[in-house]
Amino acid sequence: MRSLSIFGATGSIGESTFDLVMRKGGPEAFRTVALTGGRNVARLAEMARALKAELAVTAHEECLPALREALAGSGTEVAGGTQAIAEAADRPADWTMSAIVGAAGLVPGMRALKHGRTLALANKESLVTAGQLLMRTAEENGATILPVDSEHSAVFQALAGEDTTCVERVIITASGGPFRDWTLEQIRGCTVAQAMAHPNWSMGQRISIDSASMFNKALELIETREFFGFEPERIEAVVHPQSIVHALVGFCDGGIMAHLGPADMRHAIGFALNWPGRGEVPVARLDLAQIANLTFQKPDEERFPALRLAREVMAARGLSGAAFNAAKEIALDHFIAGNIGFLDMAAVVEEALSAVSADPLFGKVPSTLEEVLAMDHLARKAAEEAASFRQQKR
C-alpha cells in the first residue's frame, strides 16, 4: 500500500489533496503517515479519522490539548509545535504533499527529501528561499520533486520528453488579479478585502493578496528559475485574464507548447498524485468554443513592481531569494494589519533587499539550511524596520 503525508492539510491545497485522496479510496488505498495543520484542529482531527492517520500535528502547541481530545480513542498519535512538524517529516512516506504556506514549509520539505521519495511541492517559498540547496538535496538522495503550482506543473508537463537545450523561453501566465484594470491611484487606496477578491481562483487570504500585488507571480518567476534551471532571460510572465492557459514553452524550431486547464488546483495536485501516470481528476472539462477568446498582455510593472524585483533576484541568485521572500512576508503582515498601504509592500521589500545586499550571505550559494535561515532573519529585521518607518509616516 502506498504511503503518504500531507503537510498543511487544513489549508486550501491540503483540502484539495485530501479530497482527491479520499476519492481514490482513502484509507483503503493509502497508508497516511502524517497530517499537519494549524489552529483548525477540529478539521485536522476529522481528516485524521477519515484517513486513519498514524500522526496528526498542529503547528501551535497551545492547540495540542484540543487536538488530543478530538482524536481520543482514534489510535492516531498527536503532537504540537514547529519542531513536531519537522520531526513528522522524518517519518518516511512514499509521497509527501508540502503545502505549508510561507518559509515555515522549508524545513519539513528538506527533511522529507532525505528519504529519497517523492515530494509534491506546493510551497513555492521553499524553492524561492533555498532552491539550489533543495534541488541538490533531492539529487543527492535520489528524491523526486513534483511542482504543484499550476504554472510549474504546466511547464513540467510541457517539457516531458523534450530536450531542454532547445527551449528558447518559458512563459508563465498571471490573471492580473482584481486590480488588473485599476489605475495606480485606485490601487494605492485599496483595502485588504478588495485585495482578496480574486476574479478566477479560490484561495486563502495571504496568497490572494500576493496574487493581487503580483508578488505571487514574482515568486513563481524565481521558482521557475530554480526548479528548471533556465536563465532569467528565458523566463517571462504575461497577463492572461481567463486563467485557462497556465504556461507556455517556446522551442528552437519556433513551436510553442501550451498547457490549458480549468482554474482548479486539483488538476495540478491530481497530476502529482498520479505521476508518473495519469488518473481521473474531478475537474471541469474545457469547452473551447464556449471560451471563444484567450487574450494575453504584458504586465504593467509600474503598478506591479514585484515583477521587476523578481528579475533582480533571479540575476543575483544566492540567498537573495530568501531575503526577498522574508521581506515579502513581513510586508504582507503589515498590510493585513493596516499599518502600510498596498503599494508600500513592494517599497518595503525593495528597501529590505537594499539593506541586506551588502551582507556576504546575500549572493552566496547556500550550503546549509542554517545559512538560509540566517538570511531570512536578517531580511525580516530589515523589512520590519522599513515597514515601521512607513507606518510612522502615514
Swiss-Prot record:
* Sequence intervals crossing the membrane: none
Please give the InterPro entries that the UniProt record associates with this protein: DXP_reductoisomerase, DXP_reductoisomerase_C, DXP_reductoisomerase_N, DXPR_C, DXPR_C_sf, NAD(P)-bd_dom_sf
Listed GO MF terms: 1-deoxy-D-xylulose-5-phosphate reductoisomerase activity; manganese ion binding; NADPH binding
Q: State where 1-deoxy-D-xylulose 5-phosphate binds.
A: 124, 150-151, 175, 198, 211, 216-217, 220
Gene3D superfamilies the record matches: 1.10.1740.10, NAD(P)-binding Rossmann-like Domain (3.40.50.720)
Residues that, per the record, bind NADPH: 10-13, 38-40, 123, 125, 204
NCBIfam families attached to this UniProt entry: Dxr
- What job does the chain carry out? Catalyzes the NADPH-dependent rearrangement and reduction of 1-deoxy-D-xylulose-5-phosphate (DXP) to 2-C-methyl-D-erythritol 4-phosphate (MEP).
- What is the name attached to this protein's record? 1-deoxy-D-xylulose 5-phosphate reductoisomerase
This chain's source organism reads Cereibacter sphaeroides (strain ATCC 17025 / ATH 2.4.3) (Rhodobacter sphaeroides)
